[in-house]
């Protein structure tokens, strides 16, 4: 009887081990499938962004510097709110980086605008939509603030990247085209960071 019980126990343990190994294989396969899907999704998203950018008309020099200045001003204002009100250390660190980076791009655009022919003066006045977005952000607290800020950062950086790429490829002023070409990869890096944070802050 004891031998039979022992055999049953061994068989049970073996079956459990097999089930555990099978579950691990299934989990590994599921993770691999998720990674493939995510990579495919990224490629589709990038292709869609490129198609949209191709359809947008390239702004003239004055419109370009105005749009760039407003984008930077909005980013800095939102980042200052986030540096004071965000609950996530990662979000606060991102906000501080945005203040520095967009202050630098503001200076770069101003310098290029002065070299443009004819010279143009950037107008950083926020649009009504940007002001509304900042007002809504001020109303958020805690984790909801982090989510609102990062969601807005994804949208803002998508727009900024499209603007910089558009002028870098089709702009009419050489100095501004060069500045846009230098700023575009920086904005692209910010967008990737914002999307990574979005996956952590979205509820």
Residue ranges and their predicted role:
Residues 1-7:
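Bacterial N-terminal signal peptides that target proteins for export
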Residues 2, 19-203:
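His/Met- and acidic-residue-enriched segments that coordinate or traffic transition-metal cofactors
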């Amino acid at each position: 009887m004891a031998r039979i019980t022992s055999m049953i126990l061994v068989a049970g343990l073996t079956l459990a081990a097999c089930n555990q190994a099978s579950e691990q294989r299934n989990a590994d396969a599921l993770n691999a499938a998720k990674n493939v899907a995510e990579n495919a999704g990224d490629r589709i998203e990038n292709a869609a962004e490129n198609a949209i950018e191709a359809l947008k008309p390239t702004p003239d020099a004055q419109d370009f510097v105005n749009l760039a200045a407003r984008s930077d001003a909005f980013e800095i204002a939102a980042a200052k709110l986030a540096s004071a009100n965000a609950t996530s250390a990662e979000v606060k660190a991102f906000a501080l980086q945005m203040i520095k980076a967009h202050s630098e791009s503001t200076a770069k655009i101003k310098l290029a605008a002065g070299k443009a022919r004819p010279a143009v003066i950037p107008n950083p006045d926020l649009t009504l939509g940007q002001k509304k977005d900042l007002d809504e952000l001020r109303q958020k607290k805690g984790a909801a603030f982090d989510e609102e800020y990062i969601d807005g950062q994804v949208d803002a950086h998508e727009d900024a990247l499209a603007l910089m790429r558009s002028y870098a490829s089709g702009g009419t002023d050489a100095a501004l085209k060069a500045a846009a070409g230098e700023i575009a990869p920086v904005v692209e890096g910010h967008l990737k960071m914002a999307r990574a944070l979005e996956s952590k802050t979205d509820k």
